[in-house]
Structures are given as C-alpha cells and as structure tokens.
C-alpha cells in the first residue's frame, strides 16, 4: 500500500511545486520533505509539520526521514498484506491471508485528512487529549470515525502503541484508531518467531505470546519445544541441554555444570551446588548450608581458623592460639558493661596446659599416645560393664541443647592470640623437661591408699543439680563452636564430635590410665554415680571449662599429690604466679582441691601421703593493665540443699535469674569458674557437699557456733579481729536470710569459719591473686606494683573483669529462721 502511494505523493509534490507562485526562497520549497500530506497547499503543509515534534518531521536525509521508514515497516508490515513477503504458508493459509488483507482494507483502512478549523467552530474537542480546539487551528479528521471527530496533528496516534500514525494511515476498530500491526493482532495472533500472522488452527502460547507450532523451538538446536520444558533467555526459548551448555554456571567446588534442576548457592558471582559436599568449608569440609560463612580469596570457610589454613585436629593448645589477629583489644572496652563471664576467660586455664589440645582435649600432639590411651580405655570398658544401658538416650539428647551466645563463642580466639603475643616470647608456655615429675608418668595411687574417702549417697543430688536437671546433659562447648569473628555459624564446628573429649589428663600429673574414655565422655554425664571426691569436683570444673557441660561423679577418686608439710612451701613459691584475670582455674592451682585435702589431712590424725614434687604447670603472670578490682554479685537461683532435705520452695523457672553461682568452700577450694547460663554448671556444690559428709572424730571436729556460744567466741577475739567480723556482718546483714540456709546445715562451712577465725589476715591475702612474695613480684624485668590489700571491695556488676573468689566469712549465719519471701529464699554470694 505505501508503495502505491509513493507515485501519488510525488505527483502531489510536483503539482505543488508546479502550481507554486513563489520562488525557492518563499519558504514553500516542498522538495525538502520526504513526505507531505496530500491535498494541501504549501502554507498548510508548513502549518501541519510545525505541529509535530522536530525529530519526527520527515526532512530529506534527516533523522525524521529514518524514523518514518522505520515506522512504515513496523506499523504496516508487508507480510500482513502480501503473500510474497511470507516465509512458509500453505496454500490454504495463503488464501486466508489474501481474504484477511482485503477485508481489513475494506472495513478499517483509512487516511487522515488535514483541515483548518473554521472560525465558526466553537466546541471542537481533540479525541485523544480531550482539549478544546479553536478556530483556525490545524486538525486531523478520520472519515471512518465520523465528520465531527478530530485530533491535534500530534495526537493522531495508535491507540495501542501510542505512536504517531505514519503517513496518517490508520485502521479504525471499535471507535479507536490503530496502526496496521496492532489492528491485525486484534483479529489474529502473531507469531513471536517469524512476526507473521498465524492462520493455522493450532499454535503455541507461552510467556504471554504466541508461536507457530514449528517455530516454538530451541534457538540453538531448533528442537520443537511444544509441550516440553524450556528456559527463556533474552526473550528466546532454549531447551535445557543447550541452556546448560551455553549459560549454566560452573560449581566452584566440583567444577561441574549446575543443572537447571539442581538448586544452587550464589555469592558475589560465584556458584555452588546446594549440597553439603559442594557448599562446604574449603579447609575442613564442614557443610555451610544454612550457615554463615567467611569468604576469602574466592574460597568459603566456616571460621577464621580454617581461613588461615590451619588444621585444628593436628594443632596443639599453643598452636590454636595463633589463629586470629589482635582484634580483642579493640573490642574489650566495648564489652566492659557485661556482667557475665566471657567464654575466653574460661578458656585461659586450658591454654596453660600444653599437653591438652585446645579445641579437642582428647587429641594430644602425640597421635600414638592418643591411640594407646584409647585402647586402654576400651579395655577398661570391658571390665566396667555397668551404666551404659542408656547410651542411646544420651546420644538422643545431643541436639536438644541450644547453642551458646554467638557473641561469646565467636570471639575467644582473638583473646587467645593476645595472650600469646604478650607472653609467648617469654617462654611462659614451654614445659621444661628438667622439671617433669617422675611420678607424672605413673598411674594414680590405688584406691586403698586414699585417706579420708568420703561417703556419698549414690543417687543424691543437690537443689542446684535438680534445678538444672533438664539442662545437665549436653551443652555445645564454646570451644567447639565456630571460631570466626565475622559471625561464623556454630553448625559446622559442632559436627566435630564432642566425644573426642577426654578429661584433662595433664592438670596434675595424671596420664594415660584414667577412667575409661566412655565413662569420662559427655555421653555418660550422670549415668554413673561412683564415689566422689573433692578432686572430682575440681576436674568437673575443668571439664566444664572445656565442654560447657557438667559431670556428676564420673571420675574415680584421686588422692592428693601434696601433703601438709610442703603446702606452705608450695604456696609461697607459686602464689605469686597467679593471675587476677582468672587464667588459672582453681582445679589447676595448689590452692584448689589439692590444698583442701592436704589441709584436711593435717587436721585429722590420719595417714599423710609421702611428699611429692608438684606437677609443673606453666602460668601467666599478671601485668598491671590486666588486674581488675573484685566484684560481688548476689543471685537467688542456686540453693545447695545437698544433704539435708530441707524444704525450700523454689520460684518458677521463668522468675529465676540466670546468674552464675558460687558456694563458699573451704580454704583453698575456691573455683574461679562460673556457671555459663543454663548449660554450664559449677561443681562447687559437690565439693561443699563432700566437705559436710566427711567423718571426723569428736576431738577433731571444729566447734559449731550457736547463738549462745557465738557471743563467747566473739568476746575471746581481739579488737582487730572483732572489727573485721562486725564489718563483714554489717555488709551481709541484709542477706541474713540467704546465709541462714547454711547456718546449721553445713559443718564444713563453719569449719571454714573456724580456720579463718584463727588468722583473719591469712584469708585476706590468700583470697587475692597478688604476689605473697616481694622478691618474686617481677614481670619482664620490672617490679609489679603491689596494690593495697582490701578486705571488702564491692562493685556493681557493670564490669565483666574476672576476679578471684573472695570467701568472706558469713558470720550472719546466727540467723536460723529462713525467710520464705518469694525470689529470696536462699541467696549465695557469687563472685563475678
């Protein structure tokens, strides 16, 4: 149709030029336009083109001319009217096309007419924009729309595509004007592949468009995709095979294509199969599905430890401390407001035992030693035979415990590095072979040589244990969680079996013949109830440091390595080495259970063990910046009703505070270990119960102070001692109802008071970790400033700096009436 119009337009232009009464400079030189509306005078043509956008005016060799040609091909497709322009039509389809084209021309085709509105026209309105048109303006009329319908020249556009109708050619349908393309699509579907009208009876409809059946095929291999699976890429269909070969991503782990049917993980332009094997830590191969990860140099890791390329299974306790940078100092000031003890402080006692693997205490640096110890443990298992009926029950409880606070387990490695950077070059972590105890390689003393063996009820539990009964089985250790300071998820690291944990076999010279491995593992926490000792309580504290779980009586009784004769010498030699940061656990110093038992053996006329050389333990000296003041907190969530069966009503679990609790024990048995929320239980209550259950002769028993003889006891004291006692009593007067729970229950505690009463200055000096010897108070060649000893220093629980336990004598135990006020039934003084 446009081809037929070109001669007419040429004739029109030639006629205008021939009939023009003006020369070329009159402004009516029509040869400058590639097309002009037919039937207009030159001045009318100028008025019409003046109403159009400049870029759409078809000047010769202008962008407007190119736009016109483009619109002619788009709005008036030649294959919609002529069979010769169609690619593959059957004879029947060719006939349909001819009929279709003729019908459209007859019923809808038209050309717009340019007219000047008469001055008499007062109410003409543009059909497109709805604005009023005044007389004398140029308007476009469409004969098929009616005589009174008109448009602005710039508003004469297709109803569907809103483009100017090229050369004023329109198709009228249902009161709207359309271009030729969109008018044909109102009647027949158009193939998206060949752009031709579909005259066949069947077609494929996909993605909101239509295709010939044979044209809906893969763009690459031309496989017909009708009824098949396909993938659209840039508006074109592909079969699954071609798409995978052309556009599918490669897995970063296995290097294979990630199929269209396979889920994939994508991060920063990298892709992985969404499987545990592919989307896993590049170092330890732990699955990272659903877990945070640490990207580094194109690889992903579960923790910062793995990102450094270190094998945690092959490292010892010293190596594992090098796994992070010095970021602890920058974060330490931010954490000052926290009152709970952080996980890294609990780990410091483990750091001081090089024989232990930091992450996995069951794995020492010597693989042969580990293997031989395992074999021995297995041989012991055949002789024990009892208490393993609930093995499946223990394993079923593994997944029930919630993970630890991510803020705590994610930070410990930076602090470990800080310790090594400060003290590692001073050989403080090296065990010297010349000081190895010859008895360290021997087994423990047989049970028949143990003196003061306690009598323990086999199925007895204190209130504290009963309270946390549901939480006593498993707790994911902070040491076993992910190490990344960037938010590594604990999931991957928790897959490293906690069953690899043995009890700390290097704490006090005990080596390879410990109780069988299964018995010491976390799968047997309260299955077995053998006889307990003070040493068991201390070991459970160390194990709690490692695993975050409490062990109720799983170790066999272990005798003390120290006697009363060398106790003072050891104390004078090693007390100076203690750190106020809590780097030495009470179970690892001579002021722990060892001191307690040796002190008891001195008080009782019984057999004293031969004097032995103390086991060598490397320690950390305290620098001035590391010492922090002590703190005291009060908590009402732990009451030790261990052996007395006194009815004390407990508040509901939702109303109890989650504080770490300490029971004051005898002198030298002051654990620096705090309970870590619900999953970590201090074993100080065990030691307390054991003290009360020891049997003494009448002459060796210390006097219990009743309200009557207590007054006589006070009168016999010096003025200086009396002042200290009264000052202490005043401080604890408001908690008299809390301490009264132990007034007549705990003879061991009163025995402790009697010891303190004999020398009130001794407990003040021994309760701190400052040096007892002026001559040894040097660090890095500089003398350590000696702080003034303070008997009672109390701070709010704003600071989280660890402090040594302050066993203040509780002389308010005269009060025997226990108050039943809710939430204040029996408070214990705990040290933070």
From Swiss-Prot:
Residues 124-188, 189-249, 250-313 form the LIM zinc-binding domain. The keyword Calcium does not apply. Residues 830-832 form a propeptide. Residues 314-342, 663-688, 765-832 are annotated as: Disordered. It is found in: Nucleus membrane; Cytoplasm, Cytosol. A lipid is attached at residue 829 (S-farnesyl cysteine). Keywords: Cytoplasm, LIM domain, Lipoprotein, Membrane, Metal-binding, Methylation, Nucleus, Phosphoprotein, Prenylation, Repeat, Zinc. GO terms for molecular function: protein-containing complex binding; zinc ion binding. The modification Cysteine methyl ester is found at residue 829. The keyword Membrane applies. GO terms for cellular component: cell trailing edge; cytosol; glutamatergic synapse; membrane; nuclear membrane; nucleus; postsynaptic density; proteasome complex. One of its GO terms (biological process) is tissue development. Residues 798-815 have a biased composition (Polar residues). Residues 14-122 form the PET domain. InterPro entries: LIM2_prickle (IPR033726), LIM3_prickle (IPR033727), PET_domain (IPR010442), PET_prickle (IPR033723), Pk/Esn/Tes (IPR047120), Znf_LIM (IPR001781). Its main location: nucleus. Interacts with REST. Involved in the planar cell polarity pathway that controls convergent extension during gastrulation and neural tube closure. Convergent extension is a complex morphogenetic process during which cells elongate, move mediolaterally, and intercalate between neighboring cells, leading to convergence toward the mediolateral axis and extension along the anteroposterior axis. Necessary for nuclear localization of REST. May serve as nuclear receptor. Belongs to the prickle / espinas / testin family. PANTHER family: LIM DOMAIN-CONTAINING PROTEIN, PRICKLE-LIKE PROTEIN 1. This is Prickle-like protein 1. It comes from Mus musculus.
């Amino acid at each position: 149709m446009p081809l037929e119009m070109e001669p007419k337009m040429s004739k029109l232009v030639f006629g205008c030029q021939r009939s023009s009464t003006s020369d070329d400079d009159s402004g009516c030189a029509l040869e400058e336009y590639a097309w002009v509306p037919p039937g207009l005078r030159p001045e009318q043509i100028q008025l019409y083109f003046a109403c159009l956008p400049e870029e759409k005016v078809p000047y010769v060799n202008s962008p407007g001319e190119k736009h016109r040609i483009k619109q002619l091909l788009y709005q008036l497709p030649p294959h919609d009217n002529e069979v010769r322009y169609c690619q593959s039509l059957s004879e029947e389809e060719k006939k349909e096309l001819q009929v279709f084209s003729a019908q459209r021309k007859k019923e809808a085709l038209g050309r717009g007419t340019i007219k000047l509105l008469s001055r008499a026209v007062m109410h003409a309105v543009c059909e497109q924009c709805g604005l009023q048109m005044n007389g004398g303006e140029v308007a476009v009329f469409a004969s098929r729309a009616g005589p009174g319908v008109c448009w602005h020249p710039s508003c004469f556009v297709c109803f569907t595509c809103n483009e100017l109708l090229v050369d004023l050619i329109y198709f009228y349908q249902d009161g709207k004007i359309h271009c030729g393309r969109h008018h044909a699509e109102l009647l027949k579907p158009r193939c998206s592949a060949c752009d031709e009208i579909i005259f066949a009876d069947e077609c494929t409809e996909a993605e909101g468009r239509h295709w010939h059946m044979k044209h809906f095929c893969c763009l690459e291999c031309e496989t017909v995709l009708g009824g098949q699976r396909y993938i659209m890429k840039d508006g074109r269909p592909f079969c699954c095979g071609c798409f995978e070969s052309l556009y599918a991503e490669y897995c970063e782990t296995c290097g294979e294509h990630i199929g269209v049917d396979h889920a994939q993980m994508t991060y920063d332009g990298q892709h992985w199969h969404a499987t545990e094997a592919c989307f896993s830590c590049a170092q330890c191969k732990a699955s990272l599905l659903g877990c945070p990860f640490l990207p580094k140099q194109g690889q992903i890791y579960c923790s910062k430890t793995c990102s450094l390329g270190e094998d945690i299974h092959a490292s010892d306790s010293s190596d594992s401390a090098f796994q992070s940078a010095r970021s602890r100092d920058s974060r330490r000031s931010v954490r000052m407001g926290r009152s709970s003890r952080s996980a890294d402080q609990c780990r410091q006692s483990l750091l001081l035992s090089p024989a232990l693997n930091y992450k996995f205490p069951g794995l020492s640096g010597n693989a042969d030693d580990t293997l031989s110890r395992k074999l021995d443990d297995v041989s012991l298992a055949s002789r024990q035979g009892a208490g393993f009926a609930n093995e499946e029950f223990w394993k079923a409880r593994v997944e029930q415990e919630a993970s630890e606070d991510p803020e705590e387990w994610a930070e410990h490695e930076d602090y470990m590095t800080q310790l090594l950077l400060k003290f590692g070059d001073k050989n403080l972590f090296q065990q010297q072979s010349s000081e190895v105890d010859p008895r360290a390689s021997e087994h423990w003393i047989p049970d028949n040589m143990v003196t003061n063996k306690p009598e323990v009820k086999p199925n007895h539990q204190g209130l504290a244990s009963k309270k946390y009964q549901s939480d006593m089985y498993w707790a994911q250790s902070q040491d076993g969680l992910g190490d990344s300071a960037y938010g590594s998820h604990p999931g991957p690291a928790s897959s490293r079996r906690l069953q690899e944990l043995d009890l700390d076999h290097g704490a006090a010279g005990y080596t390879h013949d410990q109780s069988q491995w299964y018995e010491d593992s976390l799968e047997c926490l309260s299955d077995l109830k053998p006889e307990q000792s003070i040493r068991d309580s201390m070991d459970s504290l160390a194990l709690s440091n490692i695993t975050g779980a409490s062990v109720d009586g799983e170790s066999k009784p272990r005798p003390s390595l120290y006697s009363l004769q060398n106790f003072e010498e050891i104390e004078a030699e090693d007390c100076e080495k203690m750190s106020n940061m809590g780097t030495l656990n009470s179970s690892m110093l001579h002021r722990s259970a060892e001191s307690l038992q040796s002190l008891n053996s001195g008080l009782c006329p019984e057999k004293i063990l031969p004097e032995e050389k103390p086991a060598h333990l490397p320690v950390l000296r305290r620098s001035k910046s590391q010492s922090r003041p002590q703190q005291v907190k009060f908590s009402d969530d732990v009451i030790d009703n261990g052996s007395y069966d006194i009815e004390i009503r407990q508040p509901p679990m939702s109303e109890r505070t989650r504080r770490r609790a300490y029971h004051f024990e005898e002198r030298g048995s002051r654990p620096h270990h705090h309970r870590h929320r619900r999953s970590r239980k201090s074993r100080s209550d065990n030691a307390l119960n054991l003290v009360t259950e020891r049997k003494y002769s009448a002459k060796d028993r210390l006097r219990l102070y009743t309200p009557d003889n207590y007054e006589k006891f006070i009168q016999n004291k010096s003025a200086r001692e009396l002042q200290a006692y009264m000052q202490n009593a005043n401080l604890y007067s408001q908690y008299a109802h809390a301490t009264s729970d132990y007034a007549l229950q705990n003879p061991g505690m009163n025995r402790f008071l009697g010891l303190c009463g004999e020398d009130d200055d001794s407990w003040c000096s021994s309760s701190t970790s400052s040096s007892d010897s002026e001559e040894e108070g040097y660090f890095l060649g500089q003398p350590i400033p000696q702080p003034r000893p303070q008997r009672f220093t109390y701070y709010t629980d704003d600071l989280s700096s660890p402090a040594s336990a302050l066993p203040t004598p509780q002389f308010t135990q005269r009060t025997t009436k226990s108050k039943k006020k809710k939430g204040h039934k029996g408070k214990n003084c705990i040290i933070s």
